[in-house]
Amino acid sequence: MTIDQMTIDQMTKIFLADKESTLNLGILLGETLTAGSVILLEGDLGAGKTTLVQGLGKGLSITEPIVSPTFTLINEYTEGRIPLYHLDLYRLEPQEVLSLNLEIYWEGIEIIPGIVAIEWSERMPYKPSTYINVLLTYGDEGSRQAEITPFNCTISDLIATK
């Protein structure tokens, strides 16, 4: 399946049978999203947010291991097709997030534009003008569900045409 075939221009729910399915969704997004794309990730602990970002890295041809930046807050991976900026706001309060000036990542200020993936994005006091929200929830027997919602954009606005 390609991202074009998914036609996610409004909220779409995708069943993810296992960890590999979550990884594959990330790979698909990494292969097709363009620089400037922002993915806001929500979900309980262990729901698959980091796994999805690991897939993004694979889709971007990043070879170094993608790890959760829970304690470093931001991990930057710049050797792929385009850079990946992986943020984790789990330990922060909204006022602390405000002081990070996250807009430098999605506006490409002082950094090379890339894909921005933010775990625990519900802690953000403000959001970019356009983004994709991905809510990961638990299903039965280890499965997950991804609820993907574009805000002020369509997926087709964000994908690279070949």
UniProtKB/Swiss-Prot annotation:
Keywords: ATP-binding, Cytoplasm, Magnesium, Metal-binding, Nucleotide-binding, tRNA processing. The keyword NAD does not apply. ATP binds at residues 46-51, 141. It is found in: Cytoplasm. Mg(2+) binds at residues 50, 119. One of its GO terms (molecular function) is ATP binding. Gene3D superfamilies: P-loop containing nucleotide triphosphate hydrolases. Its main location: cytoplasm. GO terms for biological process: tRNA threonylcarbamoyladenosine modification. GO terms for cellular component: cytoplasm. InterPro entries: P-loop_NTPase (IPR027417), T6A_TsaE (IPR003442). PANTHER family: TRNA THREONYLCARBAMOYLADENOSINE BIOSYNTHESIS PROTEIN TSAE (PTHR33540:SF2). Belongs to the TsaE family. Required for the formation of a threonylcarbamoyl group on adenosine at position 37 (t(6)A37) in tRNAs that read codons beginning with adenine. Is involved in the transfer of the threonylcarbamoyl moiety of threonylcarbamoyl-AMP (TC-AMP) to the N6 group of A37, together with TsaD and TsaB. TsaE seems to play an indirect role in the t(6)A biosynthesis pathway, possibly in regulating the core enzymatic function of TsaD. This is tRNA threonylcarbamoyladenosine biosynthesis protein TsaE.
